[in-house]
Curated annotation (Swiss-Prot):
Biased composition (Basic and acidic residues): 1-10
Enzyme class, spelled out: transferase
Lineage, broadest ranks: Eukaryota, Metazoa, Chordata, Craniata, Vertebrata
Region Disordered: start-end pairs: 1-30
Official protein name in the record: E3 ubiquitin-protein ligase CHIP
């Protein structure tokens, strides 16, 4: 990713007591060697180089974030998380540390924490004017989507359990009433009367069951997984756009978000970095029509 955020230390070691120079590589040289290995996708070897750099100079945040990225590539989020936390102890403004920490937490399904760190990384990148392209926004969209899906799965499971519980209650109540009817008419010679009462009990509980199933079928759409397509979400807030507008570069933003960006950050397109002024923003009426239709058909988006 682009953007140089930390000042890196690790000067060469001095001469030894005997006056002969120390031939071992410096922390910076080890870091550069690790970078070359990383480019070659030799992640374990790169992580080892960054580890040696840390041993030589444990006070440089970038060594930890570089090793954390190796661990992420090797699908070892716990080790990556530890390195990210150490990097943040050294440099609380590190974009990469927050970004990689968010990715670790995303892998570990800690979605709220992941979103918080990814949002912090995005804010810091804007403040420091570092260009990470769509890397951070993309990770943030994924984290929000996974958190939403997790909430939806839990809700669907709870509704399914409720349906099963009510079904068992109705069936148990039916059996109890049928048994009570049988006991109350033991010895009666009029079997027709007993059968009529039992038929009434059966019909009553069949109606209970049918009414309940109808009620659940009416909310069937709510049981399904719900999602907002990425193309309807703003590229700054990552929320459903309400007033989409398009830039000369062809990128669509929510108006309030892009205007805030222009006022607080600078007069350029956040994605393409092209010069941009508020007067160049044009309402995207076609997208607005699509969004309005989506909202009208999916009332749940207000809670998304």
């Amino acid at each position: 990713m682009k953007g140089k955020e930390e000042k890196e230390g690790g000067a060469r070691l001095g001469t030894g007591g005997g006056g002969s120079p120390d031939k071992s590589p410096s922390a910076q040289e080890l870091k550069e060697q690790g970078n070359r290995l990383f480019v070659g996708r030799k992640y374990p070897e790169a992580a080892a180089c960054y580890g040696r750099a840390i041993t030589r100079n444990p006070l440089v945040a970038v060594y930890y974030t570089n090793r954390a990225l190796c661990y992420l590539k090797m699908q070892q989020p716990e080790q990556a998380l530890a390195d990210c936390r150490r990097a943040l102890e050294l440099d609380g403004q590190s974009v990469k540390a927050h970004f990689f920490l968010g990715q670790c937490q995303l892998e570990m399904e800690s979605y709220d924490e992941a979103i918080a760190n990814l949002q912090r990384a995005y804010s810091l990148a804007k403040e420091q004017r570092l260009n990470f392209g769509d890397d951070i926004p993309s990770a943030l969209r994924i984290a929000k989507k996974k958190r939403w899906n997790s909430i939806e799965e839990r809700r669907i499971h709870q509704e399914s359990e409720l349906h099963s519980y009510l079904t068992r209650l109705i069936a148990a109540e039916r059996e109890r009433e049928l048994e009570e009817c049988q006991r109350n008419h033991e010895g009666d010679e009029d079997d027709g009367h007993i059968r009529a009462q039992q038929a009434c009990i059966e019909a009553k509980h069949d109606k209970y069951m049918a009414d309940m199933n109808e009620l659940f079928s009416q909310v069937d759409e709510k049981r399904k997984k719900r999602d907002i397509p990425d193309y309807l979400c703003g590229k700054i807030s990552f929320e459903l756009m309400r007033e989409p507008c398009i830039t000369p570069s062809g990128i669509t933003y929510d108006r309030k978000d892009i205007e805030e960006h222009l006022q607080r950050v600078g007069h350029f397109d956040p994605v393409t970095r092209s010069p941009l002024t508020q007067e160049q923003l044009i309402p995207n009426l076609a997208m607005k029509e699509v969004i309005d239709a989506f909202i009208s058909e999916n009332g749940w988006v207000e809670d998304y």
